[in-house]
Structures are given as structure tokens and as C-alpha cells.
Amino acid sequence: MIKNRKIGHVGLATNDIEATVQWYLEVLGFEVIGDFKNPAGAPIKFLKRGDIIYEVFQPIGGATAPGKIDHLCFESGDIEADYQYCCEQGYTFEKEGIQELPTVWEKGARFFKIMSPSGEAIEFCQVM
């Protein structure tokens, strides 16, 4: 079992990132704490209110299910060890291997996602 992991953020896919972000700011009092683009140029914004962090992103080509929570992210202090453990347990991965996202935060992030039995993605992410 992967223990003692803090929830890092909840990922939300949208087809209109500006309207979605504005709604969270005005209606729920969130603030923007990160404004990035992925390597393909698609926008990603991190919003925070108290201990809650949302990653709002607009995939190129549109969200497959806009408004649906895309993933739940847990922080990782050792992404390689967590990935190895999940491999040993035989979990189903969204994509094989540890993914890198160099365009977020100061030094980028590394992550992988496993799939739950009901289909949601569970992400483990290490900010570099």
C-alpha cells in the first residue's frame, strides 16, 4: 500500500479555461497560484482556496468529458519508488512510464497515473 501521501490537487478538464477559472475565482473565492502551458501549448492553471488546489486544464482538441474530475493527485517524494511499487502490484497505468512536464512550476514535475476499478485516474506527482 502506498501510505502517507498528501493529496496534491484535483484535475479538472474544461473546454473553456478562462470561463471556468473566472467562475472559481468569483463564485468560490479561489486564487490563481500557477499559470502555465503544457509542451503542446495547451493552458494549465492551478487554483487554490485554503488547502484545496485545482489543476484546471484545457486539452488541445477539447475535453472528452468537460466538467468531469479528470484525476486525483497525490504528492510523491520519490516518484521512481512509487512507480516501481505500482508496477510490482500489477496496477493498470494510464500510460507506461514516468511522464515529465518541464513547463510547470520552477523546475517542472514528474508524474504517472494508475487507473482505479471505476475508471478515474489516480496521479502520483513529484514537483522537481
Show the residue positions of the predicted features:
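Short beta-strand micro-motifs in enzyme catalytic cores
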Residues: 43-45, 70, 108-112
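N-terminal beta-strand motif that seeds the catalytic metal site of vicinal oxygen chelate
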Residues: 1-19, 70-72, 76, 125-128
